[in-house]
């Protein structure tokens, strides 16, 4: 660091300053970094706003106050109030949500932060009523996507056919049918039966259909452009 400061002074003839920051460590003292799987990038092409948001959502309870103080511009009285509320109901992870929201807003802007938070809620089981286009586009960057022609969807596509589309949610139509028969397939949050047909009526914002298999396996059907 000092070498870089000196090089700038010698080459450009003007002073430079360096900022040093204490190493981030896990509660057990392990350094947080790429070797521990904790690497994130500011570049949205390397770490999407959704992934960035989730990184902060996964903050350990023991460190959430520290990170709120270090990585947001919130007043400390607001930080302390959030932590106190979190300690009363830790399962709701409200302090982590505040940290994720503020850190993502600072790096990616308010719109992407809101879309990332909404996408996170969807992918963790919240109802999709009123879901925004931006949130669905954020989801599309994180889950398998099945492109469907408008004409095919207008005619109706059996749910099993969609699930077994190449690189989507099941490896075969038989697996898709079994998942549906067992009650484990949802279209736009509603459980579907063996005869269910996905049609244009299912479209969200005239372009997307959200499909879930089991508790956490999501896919997005998207109309071809």
Task: Indicate residue ranges for each PLM-predicted region.
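Internal alpha/beta core interface subdomains
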Residues: 1-6
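Conserved nucleotide- and phosphate/pyrophosphate-binding catalytic cores
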Residues: 8-225
């Amino acid at each position: 660091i000092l070498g870089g400061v000196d090089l700038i002074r010698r080459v450009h003839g003007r002073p430079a300053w360096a900022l040093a920051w204490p190493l981030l460590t896990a509660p057990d003292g392990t350094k947080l970094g790429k070797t521990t799987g904790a690497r994130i990038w500011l570049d949205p092409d390397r770490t999407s706003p959704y992934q960035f948001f989730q990184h902060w959502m996964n903050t350990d309870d023991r460190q959430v106050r520290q990170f709120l103080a270090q990585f947001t511009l919130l007043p400390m009285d607001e930080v302390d109030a959030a932590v106190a509320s979190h300690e009363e109901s830790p399962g709701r992870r409200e302090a982590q949500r505040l940290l994720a929201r503020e850190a993502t807003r600072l790096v990616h802007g308010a719109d992407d932060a809101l879309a990332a938070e909404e996408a996170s809620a969807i992918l963790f089981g919240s109802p999709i009523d009123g879901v925004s286009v931006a949130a669905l586009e954020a989801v599309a960057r994180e889950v398998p996507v099945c492109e469907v022609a408008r004409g095919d969807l207008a005619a109706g596509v059996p749910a099993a056919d969609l699930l077994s589309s190449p690189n989507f949610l099941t490896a075969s139509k038989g697996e898709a049918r079994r998942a549906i028969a067992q009650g484990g397939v949802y279209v736009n949050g509603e459980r579907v039966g063996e005869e269910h047909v996905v049609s244009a009526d299912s479209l969200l914002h005239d372009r997307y259909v959200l499909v879930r298999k089991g508790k956490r396996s999501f896919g997005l059907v998207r109309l071809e452009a």
